[in-house]
C-alpha cells in the first residue's frame, strides 16, 4: 500500500510499507556477586552513510514505487510495536535518519542478572537505519526474554514525480553538459540543439512502434515530432508512422523526474541521440553513440 503527496521541484512524497525488526543489540550476563558497569557505543540513524546529499539508490524493490537503481530520499520512518502487552509508536525525522549519531551509554548491571538491549532497525529500499529506538531489559540469567514485536512499519520517501506518457510536460537535459534541448529554425525546419534556456518543453508519447518525442515549442505549426534525418540531425516533422520518429529508451516504465536515460533510434538501430558539435546545431543521432539525458518534470 502507498499514498502520495505532490511537492515542488519535481518531487512527490510517497508513504510505503517497509521492513522493521527488533534485534538484540547488546547482551551481558553478570554472574558475579556485585554490580558491574558496561559502556555501550551505538550509532543511531542511517547505516553506512557515505553521501554528501540526501539522495539514495534503491538496492531492492519497494512495492510498486521503487525499482533497483531508482534514486530516492527518506523523509521519515514510523513504527508501531508491542512490548510487554503494551502498544507503542516511535518515529524518526529526516534529520534523525541522516544524522548517523554515535552515542555512548554506561549501564549498571545488577549481580546474577542479564542485561539485554533491544534495538529497532528499519530497511528502506535497501538503506539500513539502526537504533530507531531501544529497549533495555534486565532479567534473571536463563529466564525467557520478552522480545518486542513490530505491528506496522511505514516510511515517507521522496521520489521524482511520475512522468505520464502523453501528458506530463518535461525538459530534456544533457547529463554531461548540463544544457537543455531547445528548438531552433534550421533550413526552414524546427531542429534540436542544446542551450541554456529551460523554457523548452516536451511530452513523451508511446505507440506500438516505440517512444515519440513531441516539442511544445515549434515555430512551424504541426512540425513537432522528433526524428533523425539520414545525415543524423534531429528535426521535428509532422506526425507519421515513420520509424525515424520512434525511439527506444534505456529505462523501463514508469519514468520519473530525474531519471537518466538514453534514446536509441528505431530506424537507425545502432544510433543514439547525442551531442556533436555541428555547423548549426549540436544534437544528433549518430552511430554507436548514446549520450545520457536527464528528464525533468516541468512544475505546473
Swiss-Prot record:
Annotated region N-terminal cap domain: where? 12-35, 110-158
Gene3D superfamilies on file: 2.60.120.980, 2.80.10.50
What residues does an N-(acyl)-sphingosylphosphocholine bind to? Answer: 187, 229, 235, 284
Give the disulfide map: 274-285
User: A GO biological process this protein is involved in?
Assistant: killing of cells of another organism
Its annotated compartments are: Secreted; Target cell membrane
UniProt keyword list: Antibiotic, Antimicrobial, Cytolysis, Disulfide bond, Hemolysis, Ion transport, Membrane, Secreted, Target cell membrane, Target membrane, Toxin, Transmembrane, Transport
Beta-hairpin domain: region residues: 36-109
GO molecular function ontology, one term from the record:
toxin activity
Q: What tissue specificity does the UniProt entry give?
A: Expressed by coelomocytes.
Site feature Crucial for binding sphingomyelin and inducing hemolysis, where: 22, 247, 293
Region span, C-terminal receptor-binding domain = 159-299
Q: Which domain of life is it from?
A: Eukaryota
Show which residues form the site (Crucial for binding sphingomyelin and important for inducing hemolysis).
Answer: 189
Q: Does Transport show up as a keyword for this record?
A: yes
GO CC annotation: extracellular region; membrane; other organism cell membrane
Q: Could you give the subunit structure recorded for this chain?
A: Binds to sphingomyelin as a monomer by using its C-terminal domain. Forms a nonamer when sphingomyelin/LRP-1 ratio is lower than ca 500. Oligomerization, but not binding, is influenced by the fluidity of sphingomyelin.
Biological role: Pore-forming toxin that specifically binds sphingomyelin in the plasma membrane of various cells. Has hemolytic activity. Binding and hemolytic activities of this toxin are 10 times less than those of lysenin and lysenin-related protein 2.
Q: Which family does it belong to?
A: Belongs to the lysenin family.
Q: What is this protein called?
A: Lysenin-related protein 1
* The organism of origin for this protein: Eisenia fetida
